[in-house]
Design a protein with these regions (language model features):
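Conserved cytosolic headpiece of P-type ATPases
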Residues: 1-755, 760-763, 776, 815, ...
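A C-terminal functional module that forms or caps the active site or interfaces directly
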Residues: 829
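Helix-coil boundary and interhelical linker segments in multi-pass alpha-helical membrane proteins
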Residues: 701-721, 788-810
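Alpha-helical transmembrane segments of multi-pass integral membrane proteins
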Residues: 770-785, 820
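Generic alpha-helical transmembrane segments
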Residues: 733, 811-826
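Membrane-water interface at loop-to-transmembrane-helix junctions
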Residues: 759-776, 804-813
Length: 908
């Protein structure tokens, strides 16, 4: 699409190109013809997934597919053998519950475009055929002449043809918090950012001051906001690091399960076992190899994290986003309102030839000159003060009134000094003047830009003395002005003079002459104190903080230095400089820069993409329409809840309800805690499952030996664990403790370690070692329990005869030991370095409760006769209780020894 620089064209040229007129607009016939060509002034929505499609997405995980296959096969075999489909139903219920939770917790249908369309639902005043009329904004076409007043939404991209003191709020597009002064003059430069196109008005912005007319030059998807809509549509969400790791884990487990099943099936056939029996054993192994509860538990752990994050002022829309925050290696943050207070504040005051910090001025230091300076800023000011003290008006002007209140000036000054005349601010003069009645006299107060103000001053008041020749002081005043400007302060000067009567309109034209200069104030949108602490916390945690703003470079670098984001000026770059780089060059150099100023929405997306190309997990904060594509492109998008636009909120994964950068860092910390806890869940479930696999594997491979030792003639009769035992332990007994690990508190050093590398899988060396040796431990204890239940601990055994009752006692001992030893083992996984006696057993009471309930569920099977029959479990002999207790507590003793000798794998 050809890019047209409307700001770079004369009005006459635009009239000719669009066949319109700056006074009469288009004709109705022209409007009809143009609409047929260009369509309506509205935004196009992107494709959305249906509820059914999102439901089906939940079944793409490889381990879930294996479970479904196992469930179907188990059901077919169960029906053929007359055993029913209990196992199938249990597996399918778990899979279904996981899918429902996933869909319920995902964000609702993407509404970014719907929110954008709401911006164009307003009515607009337009001149057609020379007559003013009101039409829906969507009916505007290029060439229409739009009339705008204070408070009007701008319905399309307009080239200004007429303006009177016109200002517009473009922060949602540019990120700049201060309203932009507009002009109708041509701009000679050809390559400038949106924020510098002073003769243009942009769709979705707001007229905050003055009035004007503009010719519609772009509508719908060709407006600046439309281009953003197009970027939102074309931006696809990537899988989160956790999703990638769990998918990889699922595939690994699925392949491992298939290999084990094939090996067991073939070995069993070689041994002469029944094919159907071996098929069911293989299915049992598949069920044992894949932790059925992992997907559901991981989902619920994330959901619990979502609830905890709400209390920390972060609303999570997309469930996996919780963990992604914890994996973040780069945070790209908007400046205004996130890193700063989004409130212009006077920081420095210049009077009596000295610059002072406002916060250090004591009440007894307020002399005659400072009073005049403050009065000038209060009275030459259009800020409105409500009964409850709320200030409304231009941010610059409210900052000046706020300064007066901070110095304890009495608001009654407004009643005692009524305004009798004024000259409003305009962009040509860069000044505002009022005439106020004060103590029976009339005082002229003027404030504005230093250069323009000094031209109109003839004297300078210092230390209660008026120096009639200001030229002697001009250089020093300018130096002080530059000193404040270098700190990125917006500087306004003030002057006054006394007159003896209310000036007429003619006299007002010359009133801004022979003024007495009294001082200057410097203001800025200051950084949040908590943001500085948060940035330092990020550095310690190995997270790079990058400022991306539509504001000017000098302001951005000053704020970034105060926050500790930037050390040297060469770490800052502008959008114009960025525009000259290719994507490859940006990706190569992106680590050099910490501040990006005067950037466009396209630039923000490119910056995020450059970091992602470097293998980083990027979190992005923003509040405006201009931030939306980058919010969606980032691995995790965080929108502001207070000042954020609907568009930004819909494009984001997380909404910060307090608009605070510190909340992002708190959310990162919470994300790390959740990620740690999910790893604990994985370690717990996998080590338990490895134990189950070992038991089944050994039972199959060693059946001939057992048969020889025990004199069993039926090779199919010896099973240590039944499929229903495995299902009960995996789905019921283990799930509650695994779920309760979600409530484990964060380790004290959680924000002192580097982020987990994005490409790093779950199976690190340490994790693999722990899963294997702890699985062997649980499997070995279960086999030992089986032997004890048989009535012997000696191998080999000669001359021992076994009947079915002894086998059932052995199975019961194995089942109870496996279930309860896994419950004690859950305490081992809470910290892989520190002893459980140092980390504390009772600092997660939900885990204690879950272990107690799960243990009771095991005993319920032992105690209730009907359930004993279903599970083929006899009453447990009392003589085995002591051995059982020792076996159940053994995991804690063994792992504590491994931790003591530092062979447990440690944290990674």
């Amino acid at each position: 699409m050809e890019r047209k620089n409307w700001f770079n064209k004369e009005i006459e040229e635009i009239e000719k190109e669009l066949k319109t007129h700056r006074e009469n607009g288009l004709t109705q016939e022209q409007v009809k013809q143009i609409r047929e060509q260009k369509g309506y002034n509205e935004l196009q929505a992107g494709k959305k997934k249906s509820l059914f499609q999102r439901f089906l997405d939940q079944f793409k995980d490889f381990s879930i597919i294996i479970l479904i296959i196992a469930a179907v096969v188990s059901g077919v075999v169960g029906v053929q053998q007359g055993n029913g489909i209990t196992d199938t139903i249990i597996i399918l219920i778990v899979v279904l519950v996981n899918a429902i939770i996933g869909v319920a917790q995902e964000s609702k249908a993407e509404k970014s475009l719907e929110a954008l369309q709401k911006l164009s639902d307003h009515a607009s005043k337009v001149i057609r055929d020379g007559n003013m009329q009101v039409v829906p904004a969507k009916e505007l076409v290029p060439g229409d002449l739009v009339v705008l007043d204070t408070g009007d939404y701008i319905p399309a991209d307009l080239r200004i043809v007429e303006e009177v003191n016109l200002k517009s709020q473009e922060s949602s597009l540019t990120g700049e918090s201060v309203p932009v002064e507009k002009t109708s003059e041509i701009i000679e430069e050809t390559e400038i950012g949106i924020g510098d196109r002073k003769n243009m008005l942009f769709s979705s912005s707001l007229v905050t001051y003055g009035r004007g007319k503009g010719i519609v030059v772009e509508t719908g998807m060709t407006t600046e906001v439309g281009k953003i809509a197009g970027m939102i549509n074309s931006t696809e969400k990537q899988e989160t690091p956790l999703q990638q790791k769990l998918n990889k884990l699922g595939k690994t487990l699925g392949i491992a399960a298939l290999i084990i099943c094939v090996v067991i099936f073939v070995v069993g056939l070689i041994q002469g076992k029944e094919p159907i029996q071996m098929f069911m054993t293989a299915v049992s192994l598949a069920v044992a190899a894949i932790p059925e509860g992992l997907a559901a538990v991981s989902t619920i752990v994330l959901a619990i994290g979502v609830q905890k994050m709400v209390k920390k002022n972060a609303i999570v829309k997309r469930l996996p986003a919780v963990e992604t925050l914890g994996s973040s290696t780069v945070i790209c943050s908007d400046k205004t309102g996130t890193l700063t207070q989004n409130k212009m504040t006077v920081e420095k005051v210049f009077w009596n030839d000295a610059i002072r910090d406002l916060s250090n001025i004591q009440e007894d230091e307020i002399d005659k000159e400072l009073k005049k300076l403050v009065y000038a800023n209060m009275l030459c000011n259009d800020t409105k003060i409500s009964q409850d003290g709320t200030l409304t008006g231009d941010p610059t002007e409210t900052a000046l009134v706020d300064m007066a209140f901070n110095l304890n000036f009495d608001p009654s000054i407004y009643d005692r000094t009524p305004r009798v005349q004024e000259i409003p601010f305009d962009s040509d003069r860069k000044l505002m003047t009022t005439v106020n009645e004060m103590n029976g006299k009339y005082v002229v107060f003027t404030k504005g830009g230093i250069d323009e103000l000094l031209k109109r001053c003839s004297a300078y008041e210092i230390n209660n003395e008026v120096h009639q020749n200001i030229n002697e002081h001009v250089n020093q005043i300018r130096e002080k002005n530059e000193e404040m400007a270098k700190d990125a302060l917006r500087v306004l000067g003030c002057a006054y003079k006394e007159i003896d009567h209310i000036p007429s309109k003619e006299e007002m034209k010359q009133i801004e002459n022979d003024l007495i200069f009294i001082g200057m104030v410097g203001m800025i949108d200051p950084p949040r104190e908590e943001a500085k602490v948060a940035v330092e916390k990020c550095k310690t945690a190995g997270i790079k903080v990058v400022m991306i703003t539509g504001d000017h470079k000098i302001t951005a670098t000053a704020i970034a230095k105060k926050l500790g984001i930037l050390e040297n000026d060469d770490e800052a770059i502008t959008g114009a400089e960025l525009e000259k780089m290719t994507d490859e060059e940006l990706a190569q150099n992106v680590r050099k820069y910490s501040v990006y100023a005067r950037v466009s929405p396209e630039h923000k997306v490119r910056i995020v993409n450059a970091w992602q190309k470097n293998g980083e997990v990027v979190a992005m904060t923003g509040d405006g329409v201009n931030d939306s594509p980058a919010l969606k492109k980032a691995d995790i998008g965080c929108a502001m809840g207070i000042v954020g636009t609907d568009v930004a909120k819909e494009a984001a994964d997380v909404i910060l309800t307090d608009d605070n950068f510190a909340t992002v860092v708190s959310a990162v910390e919470e994300g790390r805690r959740i990620y740690d806890n999910i790893l604990k869940v994985i370690q717990f479930l996998l080590s338990s499952n490895v134990g189950e696999i070992i038991v089944l594997f050994f039972a199959t491979l060693l059946t001939p030996l057992f048969s020889k030792w025990f004199g069993i003639t039926d090779i199919n009769s010896l099973e240590i664990l039944l499929p229903i035992h495995i299902l009960w332990i995996n789905l019921v007994t283990d799930s509650l403790p695994a779920l309760s690990l979600a409530f484990d508190p964060a380790n004290s050093d959680i924000m002192e370690r580097k982020p987990v590398k994005p490409g790093k899988g779950v199976f690190t060396k340490g994790m693999t070692w722990r899963v294997i040796y702890q699985g062997i431990m649980i499997g070995g204890l279960t086999l030992a329990a089986f032997m004890i239940g048989l009535g012997t601990t000696k191998i080999p055994i000669n001359g021992l005869t076994l009947d079915q009752s002894k086998i059932e006692v052995g199975q019961t001992m194995a089942f109870v030991t496996l279930a309860l030893s896994e419950l004690t083992h859950v305490f081992n996984v809470r910290n892989n370095k520190k002893s459980i006696f140092k980390t504390g057993i009772f600092n997660n009471m939900k885990l204690i409760g879950a272990v107690v309930i799960s243990a009771l569920l095991v005993f319920v099977i032992l105690w209730i006769p009907g359930l004993r029959e279903i599970f083929s479990i006899p009453v447990l002999p009392t003589e085995n209780i002591v051995e059982l207790v020792c076996l159940v507590l053994a995991p804690i003793v063994i792992v504590e020894i491994f931790k003591l000798f530092k062979i447990n794998g440690g944290e990674e």
